[in-house]
């Protein structure tokens, strides 16, 4: 779709990482080709954000999350980052409904601000809020409510995945 790339005047322009099919049509017929936009940044494996808003057990998250579990409470599960600069990946449950996944955070060392922003910009639409917070929204209809907040207020870079701005505290 147009969220991955666009075609105009014979040129395909990449917009975000992903795969799309471009179809050119003329009086003589049409032709289609698949275009795959490869990432420049492979900074980290994104958490299973597609599970946010779903009723899901801790065991089901453990089954999809390949990182090493380091802590678990009734309302959260924390995993060790897969690389030295990733401090922690944490899944949070809704306090009112402890079976519903509410948000996910990923914490990075402070020195990785640019790397993390570039990684997210390849995948999401950035919308700066202020000098410390950038919201990143997906273009995909199936994940239209997913929002990623990037913040460098602390001594680390914090990403928070959630469904809507009300769920994500800035």
Regions found by a protein language model. Give the residues of each.
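Extracytoplasmic soluble-region selector
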Residues: 1-45, 61-62
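Disulfide-bonded cysteine-rich modules in secreted/extracellular proteins
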Residues: 41-56
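A cross-family detector of function-defining hotspots
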Residues: 54-170
């Amino acid at each position: 779709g147009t969220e991955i790339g666009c075609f105009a005047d014979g040129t395909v322009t990449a917009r975000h990482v992903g795969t799309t099919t471009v179809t050119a049509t003329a009086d003589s017929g049409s032709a289609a080709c698949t275009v795959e936009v490869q990432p420049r940044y492979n900074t980290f494996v994104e958490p299973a954000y597609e599970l946010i808003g779903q009723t899901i057990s801790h065991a089901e998250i453990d089954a999809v999350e390949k990182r090493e579990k380091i802590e678990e409470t009734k309302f959260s599960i924390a995993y060790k980052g897969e690389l030295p600069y990733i401090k922690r990946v944490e899944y949070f449950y809704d306090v009112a409904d402890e079976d519903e996944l509410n948000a996910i955070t990923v914490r990075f060392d402070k020195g990785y601000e640019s790397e993390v922003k570039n990684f997210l910009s390849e995948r999401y639409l950035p919308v700066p809020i202020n000098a410390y917070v950038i919201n990143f929204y997906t273009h995909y209809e199936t994940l239209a409510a997913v929002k990623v907040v990037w913040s460098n207020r602390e001594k680390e870079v914090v990403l928070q995945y959630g469904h809507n701005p009300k769920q994500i505290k800035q």
